[in-house]
Amino acid sequence: MTYEKPDENFNRANFLIRKAAKGGCDTAVLPEMWNTGFLPKSNFEALLDKDCERVKSQIGSLAKELNINIVAGSVANIRNGKRYNTACVFDRSGRLVLEYDKTNLFYPMDEDRYFTAGNSPCTFTLDGIKCSVIICFDIRFDNPVKAASENSSIVFTVSQWPNVRVNQLEALAKAHAEKYGVYYAVCNSCGTAGETVYGGSSLFCGKDGKIIAKAGEAEEILTADILFD
């Protein structure tokens, strides 16, 4: 992730998704606000993806071309004059199956000054598997964690969690996975945005809360094979 450089980030995402697909991946996941970093402070309005049109066009078409599902992280979005932190999910046909607006905005970094909190459903289906997505700070709150975990076989958590607190993200994912008996797939950003260093350390948790696979702090493609009941 390169801070405030959406063109570079779209190109990088395209490259990494293609590489993952070539390696046999059937579902690719991107982190929170991967296109701009969290939060873009200069030229913010110009960096907004109007109604997620660029994501829908470029990432949706990539899903169709590669015949893979893509949980396309989240982007800064403007819809009907309001700004949201929005996650999009595409199936193998490139069809948009979910558009979810972050429910719990990260007020310590003034996210609530920039975005409107959402209240949309976070569940969807891919390849017949019930899934859900939550965004970063959401993982600390019963809404939407409870609905996501009770109505899914796997919860995708996309985040921009800083390096200094990345152990908290892991602990929360493990606790929720064990409590609800579901898989958690956490995709966390790495790199630097402004003065904040993000921690990477993306991971997969089993239904028992134990880690199946975990990435390091730098950029990498993390894969895991999951067998659903």
Please state what every model-predicted region is.
Residues D51, I78-E150, V164-A171, L227-F228:
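Active-site catalytic loop in hydrolytic enzyme cores
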Residues P6, F15-R92, E99, N163-V182:
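Cys-nucleophile CN-hydrolase/nitrilase-fold catalytic domain and related Cys-dependent amidase chemistry
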Residues A72-G73, T86-V89, C122, S202-F204, ...:
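Short beta-strand scaffold segments in enzyme catalytic cores
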Residues D51-V71, R140-I221:
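CN hydrolase (nitrilase-like) catalytic-core segments centered on the catalytic cysteine
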Residues E8-K19, I139-K146:
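Short, acidic/polar
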Residues T36, C88, Y100-F106, L203, ...:
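Short beta->alpha transition motifs characteristic of CBS
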Residues M1-K5:
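Short polar catalytic/cofactor-binding loops
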